[in-house]
Amino acid sequence: MSAKHLSGKTALITGAAGGIGAEIARRFQEEGASVFVGDLNREAGEKTAASIGAVFILLDVTSEESWIAAFRTVMERAGRLDILVNNAGINIRKNIEEMDVASFDAMIAVNVKGPFMGIKHALPLMRAGGGGVILNMSSICGLVGHKFTNETYTTTKGALTMLTKSVAVRYAKDNIRCNSVHPSTVETPLVQTLFKDPERKAERLGEIPLGRLASTADVANALVFLASDEAAFINGVALPIDGGLTAY
């Protein structure tokens, strides 16, 4: 791909204060996009936005009012919305027998209801601008069951996968593409903490044909491509970013 693949495009990225979201924001800005960093963590979000020359928006993805206010800010500042990245997500690490209903509801609210509301309010803005791209951060757990995660997380990511495909079919007529990406474990500070046990990390790496964890750059680079015009005919795809894990 040539330089500046997202020049002239405006993107709102949720959960972008740190980790994968921050790297997506950095790469999008690097590729010429006007980036809005959406997050509930003001301090970290403002720091990330300032470091790349982006705009921070305080965004609670579980609140429709917060979504409406965020899009209002985008339109006031940039005048258009070309890309929405639904990256925000949570995982309460309990199996189905341990999971209480309140925790289940919390995961549904962030991982499913959040993207639903974001897409709902992004669609008319994208349509008015002649089209757009919606990218949803799912997981390999949105494609297959996996022993390293829990049933509720898998349920939410599976729902997001099918929401993606349904939106892709219905809104293609408006030149709006919708795709999901499905990383395996990504090496972030949180994951490094979880894998302090070398045996546990070795077991995880043993499942991945490429023999390593994904980096945040691996994920962000895939999203740059999917958001760009080079991916103009890619719609409704569930893209694994997993080093071959789901190829077994």
Report each predicted region and the residues it spans:
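Short C-terminal tail/terminal secondary-structure segment
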Residues: 2, 144, 224, 235-248
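Canonical Rossmann dinucleotide-binding motif of NAD(H)/NADP(H)-dependent dehydrogenases/reductases
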Residues: 5-36
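Substrate-binding pocket helix/loop in short-chain dehydrogenase/reductase
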Residues: 95-96, 103-108, 204
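Active-site helix of classical SDR
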Residues: 119, 156, 164
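Alpha-helical segment proximal to the catalytic Tyr-Lys
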Residues: 124, 169-170, 232
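Residue(s) in the substrate-gating loop at a strand-loop-helix junction
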Residues: 139
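Short, small/polar-rich loop/turn modules that mediate ligand/substrate recognition or access, typified
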Residues: 172-177, 234-236
